[in-house]
């Protein structure tokens, strides 16, 4: 009997992507984050759908509707906190996934990498518009400050900002359109993720050594399905622990105060996952310069395949590059911490130094390390 899994048009596609997919036999747990991101996305879409059933995108009722979800809707509190903390888990997985690709040279799959960077941008945009929806103080002022950055664009800046706002300030029109964006973007992310996977399956997965593994492949199922299930269970455990024991740990107390355009919070800051970029933005004294630095902090990822100088793909056997990679991780964490601190003497200077180091590492030091290691191979 012919196996339906291999003949049915739809089943065949699923089979080739998740069941009989030839996979390197030596990929480590760092390769789990792709499936975890898929799981996060599905969880966010489902919890978001249930929240949208009770939420009202209107300035007068938005804050109350979120309170209503938490107090009056059956299990509304857990749906709301799973959604909020699910976003944090999403970004932890995203940064781990990008870090893995940087370390093991997966960025040499250029189409996959470029779509991945576009995905990162889209997820960041989704998280930003989503943060505005509860209409608390930090929602309102975060939206005001970040959208206002576009006014730094010469000539069209002010017009562009007012066009995005739908008026002369962040108001009802802004909230309504942000809700519309927040609803549609996850489905765009879903489509992009499918394309990301399509390009990845054209080449097959990379592995920790960075050496082609065509002579040693194993089927994805059962080996990696079971491994992914373990990863998923650990992710769900972490998410549930965070949600049930410390749901507001990563949140902002200011967001429990309804939005008030007449009172500015003492320290406006985004969610933790944007703090590194926010620190880079604040490090530049010039407004347009800051906006460009902010954009470049993520866009720089697109240039990484062009900056690869080493004859080896992975950093597994490259100690100099490893040193600079971990320095970059430490710098990323430093920037994240600086972004949460007030704009005053020691933090400002540390932030500026960390921002310079961030770009210096990616653009100069890591490519140089690759060249030195090439020389050492001959020596």
Swiss-Prot record:
GO cellular component: mitochondrial inner membrane; respiratory chain complex III
UniProt xrefs under InterPro entries: Cyt_b/b6_C, Cyt_b/b6_C_sf, Cyt_b/b6_N, Cytb/b6-like_sf, Cytochrome_b, Cytochrome_b_C_euk/bac, Cytochrome_b_N_euk/bac, Di-haem_cyt_TM
Reported cofactor(s): heme b
Subcellular location: Mitochondrion inner membrane
Cofactor note: Binds 2 heme b groups non-covalently.
Family, per entry: Belongs to the cytochrome b family.
Subunit organization: The cytochrome bc1 complex contains 11 subunits: 3 respiratory subunits (MT-CYB, CYC1 and UQCRFS1), 2 core proteins (UQCRC1 and UQCRC2) and 6 low-molecular weight proteins (UQCRH/QCR6, UQCRB/QCR7, UQCRQ/QCR8, UQCR10/QCR9, UQCR11/QCR10 and a cleavage product of UQCRFS1). This cytochrome bc1 complex then forms a dimer.
Listed name of the protein: Cytochrome b
Organism: Berardius bairdii (Baird's beaked whale)
Species lineage: Eukaryota, Metazoa, Chordata, Craniata, Vertebrata
């Amino acid at each position: 009997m012919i196996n339906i899994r291999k003949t049915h048009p739809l089943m065949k596609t699923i089979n080739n992507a998740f069941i009989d997919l030839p996979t390197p036999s030596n990929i480590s747990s760092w390769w789990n984050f792709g499936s975890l991101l898929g799981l996060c996305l599905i969880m966010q879409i489902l919890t978001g759908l249930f929240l949208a059933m009770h939420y009202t995108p209107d300035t007068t009722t938005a804050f109350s509707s979120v309170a209503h979800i938490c107090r009056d809707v059956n299990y509304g509190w857990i749906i709301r906190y799973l959604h909020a903390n699910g976003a944090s888990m999403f970004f932890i997985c995203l940064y781990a996934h990008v870090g893995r690709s940087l370390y093991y040279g997966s960025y040499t799959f250029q189409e996959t990498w470029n779509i991945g960077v576009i995905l990162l941008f889209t997820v960041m945009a989704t998280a930003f518009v989503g943060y505005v929806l509860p209409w608390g103080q930090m929602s309102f002022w975060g939206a005001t400050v970040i959208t206002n950055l576009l006014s730094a664009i010469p000539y069209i800046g002010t017009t562009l900002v007012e066009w995005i706002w739908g008026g002369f300030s962040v108001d009802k029109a802004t909230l309504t359109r942000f809700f519309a964006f927040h609803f549609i973007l996850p489905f765009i992310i879903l489509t992009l993720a499918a394309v990301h996977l399509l390009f990845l399956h054209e080449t097959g997965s990379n592995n920790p050594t960075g050496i082609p593994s065509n002579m040693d492949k194993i089927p994805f199922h059962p080996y990696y399905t079971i491994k992914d299930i373990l990863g998923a269970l650990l992710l769900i455990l972490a998410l549930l622990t965070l949600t049930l024991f410390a749901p507001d740990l990563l949140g902002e107390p200011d967001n429990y105060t309804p939005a008030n355009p007449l009172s500015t919070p003492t320290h406006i800051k985004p969610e933790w996952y944007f703090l590194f970029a926010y620190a880079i933005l604040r490090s530049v004294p010039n407004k347009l310069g800051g906006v460009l630095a902010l954009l470049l902090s993520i866009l720089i990822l697109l240039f990484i395949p062009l900056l690869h100088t080493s004859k080896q793909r992975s950093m597994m056997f490259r100690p100099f590059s490893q040193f600079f990679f971990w320095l970059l991780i430490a710098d990323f964490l430093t920037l994240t911490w600086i972004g949460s601190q007030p704009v005053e003497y020691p933090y400002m200077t540390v932030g500026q130094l960390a921002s310079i180091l961030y770009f210096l590492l990616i653009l100069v030091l890591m490519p140089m390390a690759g060249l030195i290691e090439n020389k050492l191979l001959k020596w």
